[in-house]
């Protein structure tokens, strides 16, 4: 049995190999869980990261025996479910070999087609100022986790504010994912009383266009139940060929 041991620090070299093994970039939602996660490592080459009772990342150098390592892991460090990208085939295949149940819970957008959206001259996007933060939080409470998160994104220069006819109608974010800054996760939220007017698509389209003009790659995602966000992203040219998957372990 592989002896998994809890360690203080993420094994950087192994993690780099894991990210390089994926055919598509990491998801920001999972990256945030990894950043604050509980790390376990096993000597034969691999690691696991947990957020509470959820496994949020798993990697084994010996991919052909990944299901055996995964089976050993749950005996040594029990967990109730796994969060996984559908393009993480090693983990998906290992879970299926163990008879675990897979449920799709989110759309991951890693491809974008060229689109031109019509917008009025009164709509524009600009970097947030400190004075914008209270309104950005109030208008996006169902998107941001906390005031502190809004402030953190602002301090990193990744918070944008959308205005139409001089009033704030929403906000957008750009979060570099892979460490190089070339892949950037973007997101948007529209002020509640300004929704269903097309502003979400305009925000995400402007963010994506700006990144692409700098030679960067915008990616994004949304919950499978959030059909409004899915429609807005698709209108902005994004195509979802992948899913966020929850894997459940039978009792």
Residue ranges and their predicted role:
Residues 44-47, 167-170, 228:
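Glycine-rich acetyl-CoA-binding "A-motif" of GNAT/NAT acetyltransferases
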């Amino acid at each position: 049995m592989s002896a998994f041991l809890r360690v203080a620090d993420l094994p950087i070299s192994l993690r780099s190999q894991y990210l390089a093994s994926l055919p598509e970039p990491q998801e920001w939602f999972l990256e945030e869980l990894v950043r604050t996660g509980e790390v376990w490592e096993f000597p034969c080459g691999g690691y696991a990261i947990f957020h509470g009772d959820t496994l949020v990342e798993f990697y084994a150098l010996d991919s052909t025996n990944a299901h055996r390592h995964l089976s050993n892991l749950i005996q040594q460090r029990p967990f109730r479910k796994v969060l996984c990208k559908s393009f993480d085939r090693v983990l998906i295949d290992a879970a299926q070999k163990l008879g675990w149940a897979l449920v799709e819970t989110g759309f991951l957008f890693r491809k974008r087609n060229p689109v031109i959206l019509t917008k009025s001259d009164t709509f524009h996007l600009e970097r947030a100022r400190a004075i914008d933060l209270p309104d950005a939080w109030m208008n996006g409470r169902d998107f941001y986790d906390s005031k502190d998160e809004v402030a953190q994104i602002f301090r990193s220069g990744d918070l944008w504010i959308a205005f139409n006819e001089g009033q704030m109608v929403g906000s957008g974010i750009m979060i570099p994912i892979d460490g190089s800054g070339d892949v950037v996760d973007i997101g948007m939220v529209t002020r509640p009383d300004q929704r269903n007017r097309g502003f979400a698509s305009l925000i995400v389209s402007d963010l994506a266009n700006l990144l692409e003009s700098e030679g960067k790659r915008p990616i994004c995602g949304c919950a499978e139940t959030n059909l409004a966000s899915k429609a807005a992203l698709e209108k902005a040219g994004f195509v979802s060929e992948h899913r966020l998957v929850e894997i459940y372990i039978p009792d």
